[in-house]
Amino acid sequence: MRAILALEDGSVFIGSHFGATGTEVGEACFNTSMTGYQEVLTDPSYSGQIVTMTYPLIGNYGVNPEDGESGKAQVSGFVVAELAKVHSNWRATESLGPWLEKQGVIGIEGVDTRKIAKHLRSAGAMRACLTTELTPEEAVEAARNAPSMEGCNIVDKIGSHPMTPEEVDALVTGKTLPPAEYDIVAFDFGIKYNILRQLRENGFRVTVVPAHTTAEEVLAMNPDGVFLSNGPGDPATLTDIHREVAALIGKVPMFGICLGHQIISHALGAKTFKLKFGHRGANHPVKDLKTGKISITSQNHGFAVDPDTVPDDVEITLINLNDNTVEGIAHRTLPVFSVQYHPEAAPGPRDPQYLFRDFRKMIAASKRQHAR
């Protein structure tokens, strides 16, 4: 069956269908990772996006029950050069194509994904339509009528999934869990399972709460720390969440990743802006401005913190070496820090996993200070 990917600028790519049938719209973006397609597909941060994978063969190791970052596929559509028809991996339970069909995700193969990526890199991320039923002209029109990612609150669309510490513990399989030394509250804006695993494996007892939990409700739980998760959409739209997070700053140690980093930045008085085509892949170099150390990081974001709006009492700690955008901040006197990239490495390099230990150290230092 024929499938069509149409962009709002009139570009049309015709290929073959796999997965579900129908019509979907979303923001076209690309990911340069060689592996980790199951994590990409199930990452809630990709909600509302039609994802193009630049690696030429996708699906060769199938899908399995362990590698999902949420309970279902989250993308609006999936674009590959070639779909592997036969998978080979001892953990795999089914092939990618049939799994996507069950998940209701439309896929297209047989298109030049590197051409698509270069076009999006030059022209910028744009609205798109992926369809098995419309004409090319109708698909372009559907793309042009799709909502823009800028100004779009997707956190409320995907909803939150509160979890007890026992439910978080159940996500960690095949490992002996360390003692849970500190109790933390994790805001769910679209939290990835592997972030929860890393938090638990680093000695945190994690309670996951909904995105719109108030500061008063959090403080009533008497946590040792607060974690702000990744998530989709425009961070500037989450003004009520900015307000609640601002009310927590200074009262409890805080760490944020990706959207959580952007929310902390807004709460501290900074602003965010939309990147031309975003950072999505597993090989982004980030420089620590204090130590000069460079880490290779996994990233997935279409917005960034505007460095010109960062207040004087907040320090920019990390920058992206590809475009010098802000990759991390920390308050100069209060126990608050955040990073734009994904230290949990799912998929991607594990260079920055020390950040979870840094969060532990921050909490320990805060508790010592308050014990005096």
Curated annotation (Swiss-Prot):
Pathway: Amino-acid biosynthesis; L-arginine biosynthesis; carbamoyl phosphate from bicarbonate: step 1/1; Pyrimidine metabolism; UMP biosynthesis via de novo pathway; (S)-dihydroorotate from bicarbonate: step 1/3
One BP term from GO: L-arginine biosynthetic process
Binding sites annotated in the UniProt record for L-glutamine: S45, G231, G233, L259, Q262, N300, G302, F303
Database matches in Pfam families: CPSase_sm_chain, GATase
Top-level taxon of origin: Bacteria
Amino-acid biosynthesis is among the record's keywords: yes
Gene Ontology MF terms in the entry: ATP binding; carbamoyl-phosphate synthase (glutamine-hydrolyzing) activity; glutaminase activity
Domain Glutamine amidotransferase type-1: from-to ranges: 183-369
SMART domains, per the entry: CPSase_sm_chain
Gene3D superfamilies tied to this protein: 3.40.50.880, Carbamoyl-phosphate synthase small subunit, N-terminal domain (3.50.30.20)
Reactions mediated catalytically: hydrogencarbonate + L-glutamine + 2 ATP + H2O = carbamoyl phosphate + L-glutamate + 2 ADP + phosphate + 2 H(+)
Subunit relationships: Composed of two chains; the small (or glutamine) chain promotes the hydrolysis of glutamine to ammonia, which is used by the large (or ammonia) chain to synthesize carbamoyl phosphate. Tetramer of heterodimers (alpha,beta)4.
Function: Small subunit of the glutamine-dependent carbamoyl phosphate synthetase (CPSase). CPSase catalyzes the formation of carbamoyl phosphate from the ammonia moiety of glutamine, carbonate, and phosphate donated by ATP, constituting the first step of 2 biosynthetic pathways, one leading to arginine and/or urea and the other to pyrimidine nucleotides. The small subunit (glutamine amidotransferase) binds and cleaves glutamine to supply the large subunit with the substrate ammonia.
Family: Belongs to the CarA family.
PANTHER family hit by this protein: CARBAMOYL-PHOSPHATE SYNTHASE SMALL CHAIN, MULTIFUNCTIONAL TRYPTOPHAN BIOSYNTHESIS PROTEIN-RELATED
Listed name of the protein: Carbamoyl phosphate synthase small chain
Origin organism lineage: Bacteria, Pseudomonadati, Verrucomicrobiota, Verrucomicrobiia, Verrucomicrobiales
